[in-house]
């Protein structure tokens, strides 16, 4: 196999690995957002008598949660807004849809890269047979 073809195949493999890592990271975000929606939708927090709030570095403090008052929600670039729990849940559901669209685009890119890899590999294999 010629060096340039081998380099091209290695490059495509690295791109596929990069796309796979991005898909994995986004899937983890989707799971985290789904968990947050479940928590916000559940009355379990209201019924819990003990609430520990992380203050960082593995340290927790006893605290109270008032889910009926506004939640402070990040909307990007270090900007936060106050909104009702129901609005936050809807925002999170929209975020999941956006993340799923991103996953689909990445899957399409991955398919294209795999097709390119197979084309380069098959073309080189055909040349070597002749």
From Swiss-Prot:
GO molecular-function term, one example from the UniProt record: unfolded protein binding
Localization per Swiss-Prot or TrEMBL: Cytoplasm
Entry keywords, A to Z: Chaperone, Cytoplasm
UniProt-listed Pfam families: Prefoldin (PF02996)
Gene3D superfamilies cross-referenced by the UniProt entry: 1.10.287.370
NAD keyword on record: no
Family listed: Belongs to the prefoldin subunit alpha family.
Protein name in the entry: Prefoldin subunit alpha
